[in-house]
Amino acid sequence: MRQKEGEIMTKSSKNAIDRISKSIRDAGYDPYSQMYGFLMTGNDRFVTRTGQARERIKLVNPADLASYLRRTI
């Protein structure tokens, strides 16, 4: 099921993105810039491997990731 813009992301997506964000912070990087770079390019090399963040971000719905990033500005 595709998410329409403006819909609230699922709890599992939010939890996954929170875990990814924590892993990026733990590695000493800015979660916003790494997730934004991934979202804009689709290149997973923007995201650290720490805590399996790189593997996990590939599984997140891009609409959920965009929604999360809009809320963190």
Kindly label every feature range from the protein language model.
Residues 2-73:
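Intrinsically disordered, low-complexity, basic-enriched segments
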